[in-house]
Curated annotation (Swiss-Prot):
Full protein name: S-ribosylhomocysteine lyase
Keywords: Autoinducer synthesis, Iron, Lyase, Metal-binding, Quorum sensing
Subunit structure: Homodimer.
Molecular function via GO: iron ion binding; S-ribosylhomocysteine lyase activity
Lineage: Bacteria, Pseudomonadati, Pseudomonadota, Gammaproteobacteria, Vibrionales
Length: 172
């Protein structure tokens, strides 16, 4: 099985919160799709709470679209990572890491402005697979943490695992 791009970088050296270009690819029509690693917490050191990340999933995608979408960028999807240390964002376009970081900060400010649980989009049993698993307070705490620390940039060339190590770690 081919090694996924996200497993070729050293998670022990990742900064968080931080933006990283995880992958870029061209569509057959020539559009560029960019996948960003939006790392909220340091891998293997901290994780986002279940309810907090779920509530952020409902809020973050809309707020990021408000701040990043434009003539040259359109967000396709923002999804939480299974390890609960952040989100992957796929989009059409090639915004800079700084543009993404600025939108992320603005989105976290928006999270803090949400007045109550009833204002969380699609929080009902018809549109959400686990409607009871939400916490606006936990989402706001995550947002506060991001705003207090700020958002850095992780560069693939600085985090790349050496080929020898990738061979050593490979499971056949």
């Amino acid at each position: 099985m081919p090694l996924l791009d996200s497993f070729t970088v050293d998670h022990t050296r990742m900064n968080a919160p931080a933006v990283r270009v995880a992958k870029t690819m061209q569509t057959p029509k020539g559009d560029t799709i960019t996948v960003f690693d939006l790392r909220f917490t340091a891998p293997n050191k901290d994780i986002l709470s279940e309810k907090g990340i779920h509530t952020l999933e409902h809020l973050y995608a809309g707020f990021m679209r408000n701040h990043l979408n434009g003539d040259s960028v359109e967000i396709i999807d923002i999804s939480p990572m299974g390890c609960r240390t952040g989100f992957y964002m796929s989009l059409i376009g090639t915004p800079s890491e700084q543009q993404v970081a600025d939108a992320w900060i603005a989105a976290m400010e928006d999270v803090l402005k949400v007045e109550n649980q009833n204002k969380i989009p699609e929080l009902n049993e018809y549109q959400c697979g686990t409607a009871a698993m939400h916490s606006l307070d936990e989402a706001k705490q995550i947002a506060k943490n991001i705003l207090e620390v700020g958002v850095a940039v992780n560069k693939n060339d600085e985090l790349a695992l050496p080929e020898s190590m990738l061979r050593e770690l490979r499971i056949d």
